[in-house]
């Protein structure tokens, strides 16, 4: 274009208005100017011819420039790509500064087609395809919705085309010969796929309905012979004969026939991925059948809201766990003294005492990766999955070290070996062997603390429990009265209490009313109280609601609508009165709180006592308890001269107590100072640890002990028969009696008893639990910069409510 303008300018046709003549050296004009313009014109003409001849060269150069740009996602394979080394850098011209390029705005992780991330790269777990591979249909993803919509439109249009397309009208060979060929309306015949013939009509002679017609043929040879014969019969000769064209068409019906197969394969793939090995995966690997050997453990980082301030009643266990975290955060504190960091600890104790809750609190405050897995997740239907998952679990732990690994319900995989050689037992033993090797073998795991929880430590393999694997065994038993008070304080925080109630006093009172309760029972009591208050549309929770909740947890649901015959109700009243009076006049019996003849749970009556916080029992104390338990059966016999089935539970308790005294506690002179383990309920007993003669002696002594207790109870209630009758009659009238009613009927109890929180904790040094921390654990979940801690710094203990910094 520049050359053309220069040519026109040289010819004088393109001189702009007002433009002065071209200045020449020396400022000369005239003839010299004309000569200069002729030379310039000659040069421009030569350049224009050259440019016209090199048009193909320019196109090729432009194509090469286009191809020099690497495809998107393959930049690193090209030397001048943005990820590769640049072979030639544009040199900076002297005196010319490069302007800094504006920084590219960061792409959102989920934006753009492709789901975020480069093509060919590994998609993150939030990508819709990764979620779809795990069996999760990502309806909330816009890209997935777009693909789904286009796929649905494609298949919908495909089906619409095949369902509603014009299929023509089928005719027979006879109709074709008589109605079409004989009338001369056929232009040509199209043999489609050698299966049928489509009739094409002569222009202007199309049938009224506008549909084409077709007819089936058996074979091409037969069709050609019949057509030849028919045209000869009709006298169609030479050029008038109908031409036959052979064509092959694909109507797409094969796609429709493949649709059921595709759907079945898709369903099978989805089922495999959502099968036993694919459910509950954590996003590591493909999932499904090809990753059954991968661990299903979860790595928790800042995902748990439970803190140590939410765990109470097990302060000693909390200190142990804090120390394990301190091992990981500040190992130099122990290594300077030559100490080795313990490998792990196992939390044991009855159900509901807070083992898993303590592990959750550790995950919430440890400030190190916390890996959790259940013992049952190691065992699957495939052989060899258990050991493979153990290896993968510890590989994951080493990758995240320092970290804490928690195996919940480890008894599922850690049972004692050598109990039969069944298939499942062999797989469990292989898994246990791999676990033993990973915990303390040649490939020793460093900076990984292993915690485990179980309520069946007696069935665990001894090799698993030895030091070097689980160095510490932390027993978490039912909380004492101080522990229950602390637990009640935790669970009373979110509750809307009556304004007249003080949380401190209420927690202590409830702790004194719930002896033997675990932490889970205490939480259940608080929740039941809130439910009872909501049931009655109360604005807040009062003390009566808590008392009803305790009765609900101990005795079961109150059945006020259950109909009892008058005779049955009278029997129940005298039965419960026998219990109450026997316990009232026996020194070592538990104090009575309430007695009721309203049916609860499985029982027709209910008596609530207040057991002492006691760990050692004498023979006399156990005998008084047996007599109190037999008071109901004795009362029935004294007042009615007959016995009923209502004492079944009482007799079971008495029998268990008698066997425990003789077999376990060595409290019988004839059997001697021996102790045998009593079988647990549900255990299969193949042989007894004592002879038949000893078994017979034990049975005889148990029977004698129970008979002595029964005779003693008969003598007591016969003496106090009038008191039993008073209590029974008042029960029939009021249905529920408390301690004050008993005092009015029988007078004060002749023995001293404790009933308040202060009386129970008297002599223990303090009213509350000791939650102070040792000096070395003040900053248990923080890394120390120096080796020495400033002695004057005061750090609030996490036990008292402070979270991590």
From Swiss-Prot:
One GO BP: protein autoprocessing
Catalytic residues in the record: 576
Residue numbers carrying N6-succinyllysine: 118
Record-linked SMART domains: AAA
Identification of the protein by name: Mitochondrial inner membrane m-AAA protease component AFG3L2
Biased composition (Gly residues): 109-118
Name of the gene this protein is made from: AFG3L2
Subcellular location per the Swiss-Prot or TrEMBL entry: Mitochondrion inner membrane
Residue span of region Disordered: 74-127, 760-805
Species of origin: Bos taurus (Bovine)
NCBIfam families, per the entry: FtsH_fam
Residues the entry annotates as binding Zn(2+): 575, 579, 650
GO molecular function: ATP binding; ATP hydrolysis activity; ATP-dependent peptidase activity; membrane protein dislocase activity; metalloendopeptidase activity; metallopeptidase activity; zinc ion binding
């Amino acid at each position: 274009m520049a050359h053309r303008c220069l040519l026109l300018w040289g010819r004088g046709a393109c001189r702009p208005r007002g433009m002065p003549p071209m200045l020449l050296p020396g400022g000369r004009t005239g003839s010299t100017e004309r000569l200069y313009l002729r030379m310039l014109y000659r040069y421009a003409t030569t350049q224009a011819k050259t440019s016209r001849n090199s048009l193909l060269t320019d196109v090729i150069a432009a194509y090469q420039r286009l191809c020099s740009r690497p495809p998107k996602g393959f930049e690193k394979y090209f030397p001048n790509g943005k990820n590769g080394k640049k072979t030639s850098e544009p040199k900076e011209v002297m005196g010319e500064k490069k302007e800094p390029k504006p920084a590219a705005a960061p792409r959102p992780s989920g934006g753009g087609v492709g789901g975020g991330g480069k093509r060919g790269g590994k998609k993150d777990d939030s990508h819709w395809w990764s979620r779809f591979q795990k069996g999760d249909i990502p309806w909330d993803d816009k890209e997935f919705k777009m693909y789904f919509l286009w796929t649905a439109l494609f298949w919908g249009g495909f089906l619409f085309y095949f369902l509603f397309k014009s299929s023509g009208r089928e005719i027979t060979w006879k109709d074709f010969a008589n109605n079409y060929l004989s009338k001369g309306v056929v232009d040509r015949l199209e043999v489609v796929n050698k299966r049928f013939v489509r009739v094409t009509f002569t222009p202007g002679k199309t049938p009224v309905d506008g549909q084409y017609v077709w007819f089936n043929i058996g074979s091409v040879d037969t069709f050609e012979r019949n057509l030849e014969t028919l045209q000869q019969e009709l006298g169609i000769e030479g050029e008038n004969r109908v031409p036959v064209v052979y064509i092959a068409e694909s109507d797409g019906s094969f796609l429709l026939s493949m649709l059921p197969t595709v759907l079945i394969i898709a369903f099978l793939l989805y089922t495999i991925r959502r099968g036993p090995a694919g459910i509950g995966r954590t996003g590591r690997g493909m999932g499904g059948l090809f990753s059954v050997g991968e661990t299903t453990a979860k790595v928790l980082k800042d995902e748990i809201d439970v803190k140590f301030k939410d765990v109470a009643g097990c302060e000693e266990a909390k200190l142990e766990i804090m120390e394990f975290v301190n091992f990981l955060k500040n190992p130099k504190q122990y290594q300077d003294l030559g100490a080795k960091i313990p490998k792990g600890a196992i939390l044991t104790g009855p159900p509901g005492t807070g083992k898993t809750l303590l592990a959750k609190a550790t995950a919430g405050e440890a400030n190190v990766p916390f890996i959790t897995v259940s013992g049952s997740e190691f065992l699957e239907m495939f052989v060899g999955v258990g050991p493979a998952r153990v290896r993968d679990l510890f590989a994951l732990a080493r990758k995240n070290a320092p970290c804490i690994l928690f195996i919940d319900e480890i008894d599922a995989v850690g049972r004692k070996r050598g109990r039969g050689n069944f298939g499942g037992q062999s797989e469990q033993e292989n898994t246990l062997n791999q676990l033993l090797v990973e915990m303390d073998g040649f490939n020793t795991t460093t900076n990984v603390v292993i915690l485990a929880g179980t309520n069946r430590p007696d069935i665990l393999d001894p090799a698993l429990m030895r030091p070097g694997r689980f160095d510490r065994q932390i027993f978490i038993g039912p909380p004492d009265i101080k522990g229950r008070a602390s637990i009640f304080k935790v669970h009373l925080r979110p509750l809307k209490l009556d304004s007249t109630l003080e949380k401190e006093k209420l927690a202590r009172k409830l702790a004194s009313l719930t002896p033997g309760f675990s932490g889970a029972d205490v939480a259940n009591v608080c929740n039941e109280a809130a439910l009872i208050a909501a049931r009655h549309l109360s604005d807040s929770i009062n003390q009566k609601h808590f008392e009803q909740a305790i009765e609900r947890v101990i005795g079961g649901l109150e059945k006020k609508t259950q109909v009892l015959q008058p005779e049955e109700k009278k029997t129940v009243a005298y039965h419960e009165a026998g219990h109450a009076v026997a316990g009232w006049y026996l020194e070592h019996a538990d104090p009575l709180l309430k007695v009721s003849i309203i049916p609860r749970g499985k029982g027709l009556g209910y008596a609530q006592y207040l057991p002492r916080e006691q760990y050692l029992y004498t023979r006399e104390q156990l005998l008084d308890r047996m007599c109190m338990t037999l008071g109901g059966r004795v009362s029935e016999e004294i007042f009615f001269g007959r016995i009923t089935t209502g004492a079944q539970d009482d007799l079971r308790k008495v029998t268990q107590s008698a066997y425990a005294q003789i077999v376990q506690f060595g409290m019988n002179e004839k059997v001697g100072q021996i102790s045998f383990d009593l079988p647990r309920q549900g255990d299969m007993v193949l042989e007894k640890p004592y002879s038949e003669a000893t078994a017979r002696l034990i049975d005889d002594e148990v029977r004698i002990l129970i008979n002595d207790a029964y005779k003693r109870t008969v003598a007591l209630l016969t003496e106090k028969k009038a008191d039993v009758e008073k209590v029974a009659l008042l029960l029939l009238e009021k249905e529920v009696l408390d301690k004050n009613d008993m005092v009015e009927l029988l007078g004060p109890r002749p023995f001293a008893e404790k009933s308040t929180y202060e009386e129970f904790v008297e002599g223990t040094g303090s009213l509350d639990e000791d939650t102070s921390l040792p000096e070395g654990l003040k900053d248990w979940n923080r890394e120390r910069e120096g080796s020495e801690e400033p002695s004057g710094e005061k750090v609030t203990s996490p036990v008292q409510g402070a979270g991590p910094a």
